[in-house]
Amino acid sequence: MAEASFYIGVIGNVISVLVFLSPVETFWKIVKRRSTEEYKSLPYICTLLGSSLWTYYGIVTPGEYLVSTVNGFGALVETIYVSLFLFYAPRHLKLKTVDVDAMLNVFFPIAAIVATRSAFEDEKMRSQSIGFISAGLNIIMYGSPLSAMKTVVTTKSVKYMPFWLSFFLFLNGAIWAVYALLQHDVFLLVPNGVGFVFGTMQLILYGIYRNAKPVGLSNGLSEIAQDEEEGLTSRVEPLLS
């Protein structure tokens, strides 16, 4: 069983790495144009937070080194993304991004780690507390896929929900959910089970609306849809994250 979970975890690592790298095209555009334009930094800041907490969880939880390796990679990549955003963002946005990043990726992780280590002497309880926090954050971050699905139903168009991103959300959730079952890890199982369900729902919606006649978009809805298109790569980041 341990050997099976190892191979499943390796597959999960490969898929998660591909998902972490999926925003490269977006940031290549930012670098090329030397402007962040209308792109948002929050998805990458939140993904960095999730990756950092899961890295710590993998380090302090026996047998979960595959979780720490992929999320350590993810934290590094997301740090690069956020740094590029800060470099090319206008001054007013830079200051706002620094404030949010410091709050979520400096103060919050430190507070979470210090609080769990102060509250519990048992290492198992400490790791479980971090796992609970990480799983909760992942589930909250799934609000973005829900927004993408709402846009598809409203517009009857899958333009803003690319097939491959939905497919990898489905596949990533499935692989890590299986890994969690083999490892008997409920903190990995719950968020990745949710990711699998949302990925399945998105693939079903894609099948229903891929040939449907799109409905005209209002300006407000167009902006929402555009945001989804620009931020879709990070909407899957609750990946196991």
Swiss-Prot record:
<keyword id="KW-0813">Transport</keyword>
<protein>
    <recommendedName>
        <fullName>Bidirectional sugar transporter SWEET17</fullName>
    </recommendedName>
</protein>
<feature type="topological domain" description="Cytoplasmic">
    <location>
        <begin position="207"/>
        <end position="241"/>
    </location>
</feature>
<feature type="domain" description="MtN3/slv 2">
    <location>
        <begin position="129"/>
        <end position="212"/>
    </location>
</feature>
<dbReference type="GO" id="GO:0005353">
    <property type="term" value="F:fructose transmembrane transporter activity"/>
</dbReference>
<dbReference type="GO" id="GO:0006995">
    <property type="term" value="P:cellular response to nitrogen starvation"/>
</dbReference>
<dbReference type="GO" id="GO:0051119">
    <property type="term" value="F:sugar transmembrane transporter activity"/>
</dbReference>
<feature type="transmembrane region" description="Helical; Name=1">
    <location>
        <begin position="4"/>
        <end position="24"/>
    </location>
</feature>
<dbReference type="GO" id="GO:0070417">
    <property type="term" value="P:cellular response to cold"/>
</dbReference>
<feature type="topological domain" description="Cytoplasmic">
    <location>
        <begin position="91"/>
        <end position="94"/>
    </location>
</feature>
<feature type="transmembrane region" description="Helical; Name=3">
    <location>
        <begin position="70"/>
        <end position="90"/>
    </location>
</feature>
<dbReference type="GO" id="GO:0008643">
    <property type="term" value="P:carbohydrate transport"/>
</dbReference>
<dbReference type="GO" id="GO:0009646">
    <property type="term" value="P:response to absence of light"/>
</dbReference>
<comment type="similarity">
    <text>Belongs to the SWEET sugar transporter family.</text>
</comment>
<feature type="topological domain" description="Vacuolar">
    <location>
        <begin position="63"/>
        <end position="69"/>
    </location>
</feature>
<dbReference type="InterPro" id="IPR047664">
    <property type="entry name" value="SWEET"/>
</dbReference>
<dbReference type="GO" id="GO:1902334">
    <property type="term" value="P:fructose export from vacuole to cytoplasm"/>
</dbReference>
<keyword id="KW-1133">Transmembrane helix</keyword>
<comment type="function">
    <text>Acts as a vacuolar hexose transporter. Regulates fructose (Fru) homeostasis in leaves and roots by exporting/importing Fru through the tonoplast regarding metabolic demand.</text>
</comment>
<dbReference type="GO" id="GO:0015755">
    <property type="term" value="P:fructose transmembrane transport"/>
</dbReference>
<keyword id="KW-0812">Transmembrane</keyword>
<dbReference type="InterPro" id="IPR004316">
    <property type="entry name" value="SWEET_rpt"/>
</dbReference>
<feature type="transmembrane region" description="Helical; Name=4">
    <location>
        <begin position="95"/>
        <end position="115"/>
    </location>
</feature>
<feature type="transmembrane region" description="Helical; Name=6">
    <location>
        <begin position="162"/>
        <end position="182"/>
    </location>
</feature>
<feature type="topological domain" description="Cytoplasmic">
    <location>
        <begin position="25"/>
        <end position="41"/>
    </location>
</feature>
<dbReference type="GO" id="GO:0009750">
    <property type="term" value="P:response to fructose"/>
</dbReference>
<dbReference type="GO" id="GO:0051260">
    <property type="term" value="P:protein homooligomerization"/>
</dbReference>
<feature type="domain" description="MtN3/slv 1">
    <location>
        <begin position="6"/>
        <end position="92"/>
    </location>
</feature>
<keyword id="KW-0472">Membrane</keyword>
<keyword id="KW-0677">Repeat</keyword>
<comment type="subunit">
    <text>Forms homooligomers and heterooligomers with SWEET1, SWEET2, SWEET3, SWEET4, SWEET6, SWEET7, SWEET8, SWEET9, SWEET11, SWEET12, SWEET13, SWEET15 and SWEET16.</text>
</comment>
<keyword id="KW-0926">Vacuole</keyword>
<feature type="transmembrane region" description="Helical; Name=5">
    <location>
        <begin position="129"/>
        <end position="149"/>
    </location>
</feature>
<feature type="transmembrane region" description="Helical; Name=2">
    <location>
        <begin position="42"/>
        <end position="62"/>
    </location>
</feature>
<keyword id="KW-0762">Sugar transport</keyword>
<feature type="topological domain" description="Vacuolar">
    <location>
        <begin position="1"/>
        <end position="3"/>
    </location>
</feature>
<dbReference type="GO" id="GO:0007623">
    <property type="term" value="P:circadian rhythm"/>
</dbReference>
<dbReference type="GO" id="GO:0009705">
    <property type="term" value="C:plant-type vacuole membrane"/>
</dbReference>
<dbReference type="Pfam" id="PF03083">
    <property type="entry name" value="MtN3_slv"/>
</dbReference>
<feature type="topological domain" description="Vacuolar">
    <location>
        <begin position="183"/>
        <end position="185"/>
    </location>
</feature>
<feature type="topological domain" description="Vacuolar">
    <location>
        <begin position="116"/>
        <end position="128"/>
    </location>
</feature>
<feature type="transmembrane region" description="Helical; Name=7">
    <location>
        <begin position="186"/>
        <end position="206"/>
    </location>
</feature>
